Amino acid sequence: MAIQALLVILAVLLVLLFLGVPISYAIAVSSLTAILSSIDLNVAVLTAAQRTFVGMSKFSLTAIPFFILAGNIMNQGGIAKRLVDFVMAILGKMPGALLVTNIVTNALFGAISGSASAAAAAVGSMIRDGADEQGYDPAVTAATNAASSCSGLLIPPSNALITYSLASGGTSVAALFMAGYIPGIIWALCCCVVGVLLAIKLGYKGTPGKFDWKNLGVCTLRALPSLSLIIVVIGGIIGGVFSATEGSAIAVVYALILAFCYRSINLKSLWKIIVDSAKMSGMVVFLVGVSNILGWVMAFLQIPDAVAAALLSLTSNKYIILLIMNVILLVSGTFMDVTPAILIFTPLFLPICQSFGMSTIQFGLILVYNLCIGNITPPVGNALFVGIKVGRTSLSKVMPYMLMYYVAIIGGLLLVTFIPAVSTALPQAMGLM
């Protein structure tokens, strides 16, 4: 019965998505369709409305709109150029300096803005012209830009990790933020290894001349105010000075002060940023609300228990089960955006992982890491196609290089999956677990 209900949910969901129905409505309709065989229609609709309201009324959910607004303000604040100059001043002498600079800057910018697509667009456009002048293949720079754009989604502050906290029943946001650093850095390092190897193979050299300490000092001073946002907000949250929600509001105030000091926005552009952020936040908050319907349906029909029993009937080896889950998440991530996928798969797979002793922290990082890979993989791959568009190249030219990045990034995924300390060492050291 439970497996049949799961198949109904997936079938209806896929059909509705194929027809172009917004993901929020598709989740609600597919969930209700699956449970109508068990309870009365009126009861199902009333309960669905109540679950949606409960899901949208969680106080911790207010952190997401604030972080979205702060990220959008910073996107318009001219920080990409400052970060690129800062990283280039440090790494400019390396082989393929522009590739490595792109990777590291994407990690920093993605952490500040909270968006892989925004990082790929802003940083990629800054790198592109210099790369063209130095004879870099546009396909190589586009692949590097796209592949590294998602590392910032793992490095806090991360809306994906906040969403997972809500979906998992209140996992500590501070612990998740602390846990995200090592996987995010692993992602960036994997990309750096591939970038340097490509640079050596293709003959891309660093900037000539001696290391310029004066330029480094100037670039550091220019980038420091932007980088301080991460230090202030994350330091305050992890240190217990304020909650994630309060930290998100502080991030907005800090971003506003910085943007006005840089004179990068005015009142007219600020209003547009607020409206765009409100639209984006409305979609996310409503999505979180309707995902509560899915969680209720799965719990009512005992779908996670049935899935666990089905997997255990195949094998009792937890490592094989984790590999199967990774494959499912990787494939699903290529068709779905990160937020809805988190809300769908958390209630399905988290109980299974908890049954063999995995912490909610580690599962959260495995989940988000997988879905980030999907964000740079066709056929949907939002960040991938942004990188291709910014790089002025084509998918067919980029994919041979992307395959190299996929191998390295999936290697990082295996570390996150099979070595718990990768996700749990920092939270445990900080007393957050």
Predicted regions and their residues:
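Alpha-helical transmembrane segments of multi-pass membrane transport proteins
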Residues: M1-M433
